[in-house]
Amino acid sequence: MPGVEDPCDSQGTPPEEPSTSVAPGEAAKEQSPRLCGYLAKLSGKGPLRSFKNRWFVLDPRKCQFYYFKHHQDAQPLGQIDIGDASFSYDLEAEEGQFEIHSAGRVSILRAPSRHAMTYWLQELQQKRWEYCNSFGALKRESVINPASTKVPIGLVARESPDYMGIPNINDAERARNQFAVETCPSVLGDQTSAEQASNNPAAVQVLLRQWSNDIRSSMQHLRPGKSSDCRKSTFYTNEEWELLNPTPKELEESLLHVEKRKPPTEGIKGSTGMSFPFDFGRIPQRARRPLREIMGVNKNRTECLADSLPVSDSRMESDVLLKLQSQEEELERLKKDLLSQKELVRLLQQSLRSSQYDKYFASPFCDGLSKEHLHLLQQKDTQIQELNHLLERQTLEKDHLHQEVEELKCSVKELKDQLNMMMETIQAKDEVIMRLSRQLSKYEQHTPSSTVAAEIPVAPQLEELNRLQDSLQGYKAQNTFLNKEILELSALRRNAERREREMEARYSNLEAKMCQIESKYLVLLQEMKTPVCSDDQGTAREFVNQLLEDALKVENAEQPEHTFVKPHTVSKYDIHGFLIVPEDDEEEEKLVAKVRALDLKTLSLTENQEISNVVKWDNYFASTVNREMACSPELKALVRNGIPHEHRSRMWKWFTNLHIKKLKDEAAPGYFQSLLQNALEKQNPASKQIELDLMRTLPNNKHYTSPTSEGIQKLRNVLLAYSWRNPDIGYCQGINRLAAIALLYLDQEDAFWCLVTIVEAFMPRDYYTKTLLGSQVDQRVFKDLMNEKLPRLCAHFEQYKVDYTLITFNWFLVVFVDSVVSDILFRIWDSLLYEGSKVIFRFALGLFKYKEEEILKLQDSMSIFKYLRYFSRTILDARKLCNIAFVDMNPFPLRQIRNRRTYHLEKVRLELSELEAIRADFIRERETNPERRDLISDDEEDS
């Protein structure tokens, strides 16, 4: 983790700056880098108060600032609410110290430097602004209105909150950014600085300004009189800077000029033992101008060069210089090759002449001459060759001397130019010295004679001036920060007032509606109290009909609404998209469904259990800020109490990865997409049945009501991909509902892996095959558990010969989908995905235990079976059901279920094999017996 250090003791020096890190585990891929780092916190009481290093982590979801003793700790020492906090700092206090005012308390913190303090304050202000001006700020009302909470993925995430959108706050944000303090990039963590540079245009400007300053500082040694190693003056002319993009001809001339100039210059330096401090070699021969003109141009250029030079131009110049250097090296190499080729040609010419002479002496013309003449001719030829060689050497030496003379002339000319410029420089410096001398003499004439006495108070005054300037800069920064803080707090206060007005309007609307209903009931009671004189009840019947009609009304989006918010009444769908009041049922059943929905909402509003559960989950996530989530009794208890709506998507994904991590790691990247592509491109025997069952999967859920619904498209993809993955199952009616429930909180790929987890990891083999062997075995196991846990109820069923497995078979196959209300359904799924299929037995027993007394009161098989078909939907208290399933049903060992599954598996296999043998005998007898064939109907023959 960048910038994280473990302090040696509580009084040690904290790390230099805050840092950003990514939350561990799988959630790290989804969450943005979080703000964390060491700060010194003032703690203790009375005179024992002291600063102690604490590891601070900001949770942006709740805008809570948690602090730990060390960054490895799991439990925080405390927390500071940043959402309702204000910030300040005092210049008179220690460097880096600032205060956070929140919930009536003042927390005093200290950063290692002023830059780090500025960065912390800016980040905390930004997080507070984002939290208070986003829909996440409405999560504080999510207990009353769960639908207003957004989840990251899944079909439920498409739900928009009931509150209207927050007004445009760009004006406040723009005014707020005017007071933003620029932070030095060195203070930022690696990831934070990279993010700010890519996401914030202002940060890009800061980086560009910093690069410009770096260029300016790197060019200081180029200015006259600024070098520390030698008094060297360097002048740059317009022509010199134009050489950055030279033409090829100018480049060649310049290189030749340098080639000619180097040898004599070195020779002169070596002979005279001195070197001139002026570097005029960079200036071309044609670029000579008077010194005063050059100095004037140079002065203007050095003043505006660093500020006007863009970063992009400097990059282009560096690229051009690199290309120029490579071309120079290439030119040097080609010149060397040319010289070697010339030398080779010369040697070849000499060898050619020698061979011609040898050939001449070997020719027939020399056959008639005597040996003395031949010897004399050979000597003459040798002398001629030597003379030719000598002539060539003399010619080369002459050319070389001529070249040296030309170079010496050029160097003499350059030295004269340098001497003239040096003389002009000396003259200019003499003029400056004379002018300064005259000014000094005038100053001495007008000042008292005792100059030493006048210089004594100058040093303290300068120190005081510097101190005042530093204080002025500090107060300016403090004033800027406080202006920004005041502006931001004002905007947040206006937003809070707006939300308060909306809540008041909403409550006024609900109160008015409550008064209307109450007045109608009072009138109805008054009418019912009066004696009835005839069979016609008159007004009372009208009031009853009116009340029933009002109760069955469902909120319509086209009805006029309040100006600010929608009245939060019972809507047509629940938070998960399930239809509350059936559309095709009779009026009496609609009324019962409406009453059930109102009872369920009353439970969620009146009980404090849901609120405490949300707080427990928030505390749990706060304890996992510095560590990965792991299986623990604490997490098990939380899951059994139910996962809050806003955390369910994250936890379901984590549960899936927990159970099939090995399978996912073995799968190739893009495994789901490749399966889906194969299923779509190739012939799939299960695709036809999948298409038939898509619209019948969850017809009472608005995400699956239309063929063009997003849920239908995703469900098709998941089922096709799984049918291609597992050919033994392919597609079985039942897994479509499992996938549909998973898609409500997960995306396509995660829902696919969730389906794999349930079918292949949780359920026994052959659970969804053609024989449904595993499902039949589980029904036998459930019968044994019923005899053990609920003997009275089991005896009651046996007395009236009621086979309750006809009802429970579907519970196990689709994990209670369409069998219980949605709130209980998702509580069951929470525990299922964490603990496995044992949970299904617990809840099935819990449902019967919940309604045991009501079932025992029924005294005939028809009424019992009719009651079993719908009784599970009448159970609304999820907390009571979970308490029965996880407390009253104990002990409930998994080993017992495994042993009973193994025992019944052999029995069911034996029965299935016997049935298969009977079926085979029947088919064989029907085929061989003509009399039996005559009994076959026409329809059977067609089939």
Curated annotation (Swiss-Prot):
Q: Which residues cross the membrane?
A: none
Q: Which gene encodes it?
A: tbc1d2b
Stretch list, region Disordered? 1-29
Give the chief site where it resides: other
Question: What name does UniProt use for this protein?
Answer: TBC1 domain family member 2B
Enumerate the spans annotated as Rab-GAP TBC domain.
642-836
Entry GO MF terms: GTPase activator activity
- What organism, scientifically named, is this protein from? Xenopus tropicalis (Western clawed frog)
Q: InterPro entries given for it?
A: PH-like_dom_sf, PH_domain, Rab-GAP-TBC_dom, Rab-GAP_TBC_sf, Rab_GAP_TBC_domain
